[in-house]
């Protein structure tokens, strides 16, 4: 999980800042609170998605068609909301690194320690290799969606 986060953290932070989002530690805490609530709402409502729907979205080349398909088939599902939690944790890690550029030591950073709670939560929701693959794919799709959307 930490490997996935380190691979995407800077991309997540840049996408958030491009959309005008605050990536400070306090904003990340509030975002995690919101994303966690949205995750449990999706889970309680059983808004699941299939690996097939994810694979279909991966094949869409046209950006407008992709956004429409994402909003229709994947947005606000359990997998989408879990990807959001991971993206916020990754953004927080990248922001912590950027704020402490020269002397950044993740193992000693309180922001990284706090964000690791979100990572632990995500790991607790994963039941096996299929869930890991779904999450990996959803994070990639969600990042594409975030980079294309205009909010």
Where are the language model's segments positioned?
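Flexible "arm" and connector segments at domain edges
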Residues: 1-151
């Amino acid at each position: 999980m930490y490997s996935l986060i380190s691979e995407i953290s800077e991309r997540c932070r840049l996408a958030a800042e491009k959309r005008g989002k605050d990536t400070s530690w306090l904003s990340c805490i509030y975002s995690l609170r919101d994303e966690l609530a949205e995750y449990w709402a999706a889970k309680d409502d059983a808004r699941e998605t299939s690996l097939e729907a994810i694979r279909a979205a991966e094949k869409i080349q046209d950006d407008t068609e992709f956004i429409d398909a994402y909003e229709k088939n994947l947005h606000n599902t359990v997998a989408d909301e879990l990807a959001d939690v991971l993206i916020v944790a990754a953004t927080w890690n990248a922001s912590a690194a950027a704020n402490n550029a020269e002397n950044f030591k993740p193992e000693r950073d309180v922001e990284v320690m706090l964000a690791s709670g979100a990572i632990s939560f995500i790991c607790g929701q994963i039941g096996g290799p299929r869930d890991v693959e779904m999450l990996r794919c959803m994070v990639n799709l969600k990042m594409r969606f975030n980079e294309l959307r205009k909010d």
